[in-house]
Amino acid sequence: MRLCELHCYLALLGLSLVLCGRCANSQLEPDLDFRHHRLLQRASATGQATQDFTKRDVEKLLSLLSIPEMEMREKGLSMAGESEDLRLEQERSAESSNQLPTRVRKEGCKNFYWKGFTSC
């Protein structure tokens, strides 16, 4: 009996998380939907919505619709690019600190290492 209740609670929790996630995604892009709606209103106001579209009109409409999406992608890519640049710079600085010039040591020189003596 308890196991069945637990399954029900977990199912409800999962369902609520999925629904909240979708609501959050829809709230993040209301501006994009608004732009699409405005573009379609302009098209219907000029009478293009009732006419047959030519290939050029369709291409122009699709390019106008994809502009906000491209801007969103570019923002994401620029942020990803900045983090990638930062990571590469950190790797380079770590590599440069590891590549210290080797010292020229005298023949037969010995250093004490915690496990024993080593040659220089």
From Swiss-Prot:
Signal sequence range: 1-23
Positions of the UniProt region annotated as Disordered: 76-100
Lineage: superkingdom: Eukaryota
Primary localization class, coarse: secreted
Disulfide bond keyword on record: yes
Xref: InterPro entries: Somatostatin (IPR004250), Somatostatin/Cortistatin_C (IPR018142)
GO CC annotation: extracellular space
Cysteine disulfide partners in this protein: C109-C120
GO molecular function per UniProt: hormone activity
Biological process per Gene Ontology, one example term: regulation of cell migration
Bias-annotated ranges (Basic and acidic residues): 84-94
Annotated propeptide span(s): 24-92
Localization (cell): Secreted
Keywords: Cleavage on pair of basic residues, Disulfide bond, Hormone, Secreted, Signal
Family: Belongs to the somatostatin family.
Function summary: Somatostatin inhibits the release of somatotropin.
Protein name: Somatostatin-2
Upper taxonomic lineage: Eukaryota, Metazoa, Chordata, Craniata, Vertebrata
